[in-house]
Amino acid sequence: MDLLIVSGLSGAGKSVAMNALEDIGFFCIDNVPAELLPSITAFSKAGDNQLKRVALSMDVRGCHTSEQIEQALHQLDEQGIEYEILFIDAPDDVLMRRYSETRRRHPISIAEGISTREALAKERQILQPFRERADYTINTEFLSTAQNKERICNLFAPDGGAKAAMRLTVCLLYTSPSPRDISGS
């Protein structure tokens, strides 16, 4: 089983990453609590449930302290479960702008009644174990949604990236094409 743990700051692009991973064949589970990580991975490997490629999204909604994260990762290590970590990040000013543009509130801001800036600082501290152990870190500061998705596909698609598709549309205004034009001769 290929196990990928996806984490990162709220608003940095985890949902885009998870959607891209699902598009390239990963079985994706969002918002996994730290306490359930070892159980979910064991279930994913067991008998008829054996899944080939699993991506688990973990963030501050299910991981309330850095100690919980450390303990969950330690349990995976003790069980001999191999995994990789993808950490999605962006600078605080970019995340603040994204929250402002979408008019959404940060999950910690809602739960604890603190400012978005304070919530981001707390979130960075909580998620630090993921960041420190990350095999891949993507800074989405200068990436569009499409570029973020493309980067994920290039990293994790079995063939090394999504195949390019090209569509050609021809408009014939005044005449039909001759058979020679269609055959390419």
Model-inferred region functions:
Residues 83-128, 136, 140-141:
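A glycine- and Lys/Arg-enriched "phosphate-lid" helix/loop adjacent to the NTP-binding pocket
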Residues 13:
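Conserved glycine(s) of the Walker
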Residues 9:
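P-loop (Walker A) phosphate-binding loop of NTP-binding proteins
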Residues 174-185:
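Single conserved hydrophobic/aromatic residue that forms the stacking wall/gate
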Residues 134-145, 172-173:
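Phosphate-binding beta-loop-alpha motif at adenosine-nucleotide cofactor sites
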Residues 30, 40-73:
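Conserved nucleotide-sensing/catalytic segment adjacent to the nucleotide-binding pocket
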Residues 6:
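Hydrophobic anchor at the beta1->P-loop junction of P-loop NTPases
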Residues 23-30:
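Post-Walker A helix-loop "phosphate-sensing" segment adjacent to the P-loop in P-loop NTPases
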